[in-house]
Amino acid sequence: MDLFKAFGGKSNSKDIAKERLQLLLVHDRIDTSPRFLEMIKEDILNVISNYVDIDEKGLRVEITKERKSDDTFISALHANIPIKKMKQVIR
């Protein structure tokens, strides 16, 4: 699912190619499918968009794998989600 189209924005082929390349690079780093990362991004956006308006063009979600001091590896999810404004949430 294209994040730009999901929220009514338009994307061009450059944006789509860039997003696909980023997903492939992450896939290579952590041995998971690009679709898995896309599903995580969709879920994060669905939850966060209940509380804030997000700038989808600046959205970056990636999973990295880093070596710890004991030579084991740990994966980490990094999300950079630019917030346009907070929504008024009544509970």
Curated annotation (Swiss-Prot):
Keywords of this entry: Cell cycle, Cell division
Q: What Gene3D superfamilies does UniProt report for this protein, alphabetically?
A: Cell division topological specificity factor MinE (3.30.1070.10)
Q: Does the keyword Flavoprotein apply?
A: no
Keyword Cell division part of the UniProt annotation: yes
Pfam family example for this protein?
A: MinE
Q: Which InterPro entries did the record assign?
A: MinE, MinE_sf
> Which superkingdom does the taxonomy of this entry point to?
Bacteria
GO biological processes: cell division; regulation of division septum assembly
Q: Which NCBIfam families match?
A: minE, PRK00296.1
Family per similarity comment: Belongs to the MinE family.
Report the function annotation for this chain: Prevents the cell division inhibition by proteins MinC and MinD at internal division sites while permitting inhibition at polar sites. This ensures cell division at the proper site by restricting the formation of a division septum at the midpoint of the long axis of the cell.
Protein name, as recorded: Cell division topological specificity factor
Q: Which organism is it from?
A: Caldanaerobacter subterraneus subsp. tengcongensis (strain DSM 15242 / JCM 11007 / NBRC 100824 / MB4) (Thermoanaerobacter tengcongensis)
Q: What is the lineage of its organism?
A: Bacteria, Bacillati, Bacillota, Clostridia, Thermoanaerobacterales
